[in-house]
């Protein structure tokens, strides 16, 4: 905590901060075999990040989308071969991984999940809890993962699925800021743009089948109004919206996802908590995306450095659009669907997500310090009474984030540039000259 405050106060450099807070995990060859299964959420994710880091050192170029099945097959074969070889190095070479996992935050995140879901005791035949959760927390200052939990804690000798990065689920409305709203804020929308919430002939309905009429965009996001997201996405086009997710390495975008249903989270495969955390972290980071990892460096048995992490930033959203999205999502916490997750003494922004029949619940949000994404549901999708983004996911998010920010100074979000009256008047004049609004939902 002391080092964190010193870093934010500018008294120590980022490198000094990590030297002071870094955790060491020494990897040794598993006792039984190189393929022995690993139970810890930290271990599974760390091994994966470290293996991919060594692949990167070998010059491997990671890809997620391909022009043909032949190209995809060829890539998959090359990936599997090198992944296996690099993982064998980790297990047999006496390597040490220096990771950015904060063990105190890891404990807090695990406890938040376990405590919130302790009332759900049903288990599957293999002894795994049916009701599950996963979450990822990212340090916004560095871009590194500081905590990752792949499921509820329980005694098991079997392989434990790390749902935080190995499972893909429907995100519901939590995807709207990344896929619809921030892209449209780049194209001229503002938090105050008036949009029309009305019943659509061929589109979704709102909760309780109620419609608010002419409302500011801020209100539409805060109350997760489906018709507005649908209309704005229709104007944006799925192709344009999904490209933002691809630019942030969302790995499971399928051909069938190029429909308006994805504006409400209706994906073929889905997204992972890790992807959602890194996407929201990009919004907090003024639109700059950083590939998530927990590996800082790797050394061999002779203490020679074989890998040093260097996170590169990629602009995904324009700065002002990202800041406007952040400002809008503070309203989600103040007066919208995320009210129950609002932190007591720390400015925060976030978004809920709930899928059809309450099979999945999400809460994704951030402060200036940390971004955390939480998913709750069953491994085999099942309707859960009272499951929504504003219930169990929000409870987990708030419990963890409250603990993570204990003792930290309150930090306000950075302001966005206000549109000048001249710009607004010119915009209105152009719309009138063309006798139609420049945006599908804009009410003149």
Q: Which role fits each region the language model picked out?
A:
Residues 99-123, 135-139, 147-149, 154-167, ...:
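A penicillin-recognizing enzyme superfamily signal
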Residues 1-3, 7, 30-37, 92-100, ...:
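Second-shell loop/turn segments in exported
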Residues 6, 109, 142-143, 169-195, ...:
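Active-site SXXK
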Residues 131-133, 156-178, 191-194, 261:
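Short active-site loop at a secondary-structure junction
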Residues 1-100, 246, 251-252, 261-265:
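Non-catalytic, structured segments within soluble enzyme domains
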Residues 33-38, 42, 189-242, 289, ...:
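Conserved catalytic neighborhood of penicillin-recognizing serine enzymes
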Residues 2-10, 20-23, 27, 53, ...:
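Structured segments of extracytoplasmic/periplasmic soluble domains
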Residues 205-206, 237-278:
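Mid-domain, small-residue-enriched loop/turn segments at the edges of structured enzyme/sensor domains
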